Amino acid sequence: MHEIKITMLGPSGVGKTTLLTAIYEQFESNIGKTNLQLTPDEESSAILQERLVELKTLLDDFEATGGIQGTEGEPEELRSFIFGLGQKGQKPSLQLHFQDYPGGYHAAKATPEKRQFVKSLLTDCVAVLIAIDAPALMEQNGKWHEFINRPQQMTDLFKTAYQDLDSPRLVIFAPVKCEKYLQSEASAKELLQRVREGYSKLIDLFNSANLLPKVAAVVTPVQTVGSVVFSRIDTNNSTPHFRFRKISHDAVYNPQNSEQPLRYLLRFILKLHIDTRSRSWGIFSFLRDWLGRDYHLKQAVSQFASECKTNNGFALLQGEDLLKIS
């Protein structure tokens, strides 16, 4: 079975695993009448179910913590989360491999092997989901953005990994823990502007002459819990601890827009299928045949991908021609 590789990207604690869990949980809720099915393999299902339980128990206390247990392990021990994609009631015809990894691989003390592991992910993966800790970006005028999100380090990684690209890539900036900043159109607009400013060097890199034709970049804020908002920052030994609170005592788990990264991913894949150049792009050469053989699957993917948001904090930063399917 053909596969598409996607990696999460971000330092420890920003919300990579939380984001992946929310994407998994909400797909079924948002698929609606679309004839698509996303089926995790047994191990992926078991792990993500455990993470989902953790995510929902954040609401057991009125003051919630910031996230769930992150990923741990050495490079050779890590596994990707594997989902089969196809029509409902049929065997999947494409595998989506989502790679998660410990954010500690970005730490100064990380071994060369761990650093190389992350670089290889960026080189090999079709799409990258950059999890952004929104409170660190937004609060106290972004005081903790560099400390938590490490934007310069992320930029340096792409400088190396995206040299001499021979095929298109999709980069998704995904602010998480962002419930507070999506309460109004004005605050959502400010969140988007802060993403542009906080990652300006990386966006400028993507906008360079060599990368502009090959990199599509979008912003998709994901409310991974939906019913908690940022409350305050406590500091201990100069280390920030972000605190959150439920919007009410009886608030329940209610994630919002967590399927949007997947919509953009499938839109990107569909465009590559349509593009006649894809036969010369090695990692995508199979796409024309994959969807070409199954009209109904193509229609289902197209329907799901058509609902990508582009306002109220969402934006297509560049690469419209890599995402335009009509």
Predicted regions and their residues:
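An interfacial alpha-helical scaffold signature
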Residues: 24, 325-326
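Acidic, Ser/Thr-rich low-complexity intrinsically disordered segments
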Residues: 289-325
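Switch II of P-loop NTPase G domains
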Residues: 67-129, 137-143, 156
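Conserved beta-strand elements of beta-rich interaction domains across eukaryotes
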Residues: 13, 88-90, 103, 178-179, ...
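Short, charged/polar micro-motifs that form catalytic or ligand-binding hotspots
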Residues: 5-13, 89-92, 108-122, 144-151, ...
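Conserved GTP-binding G-domain of TRAFAC-class P-loop NTPases and closely related GTPase folds
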Residues: 124-303
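Conserved G1/Walker A P-loop phosphate-binding module
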Residues: 1-98
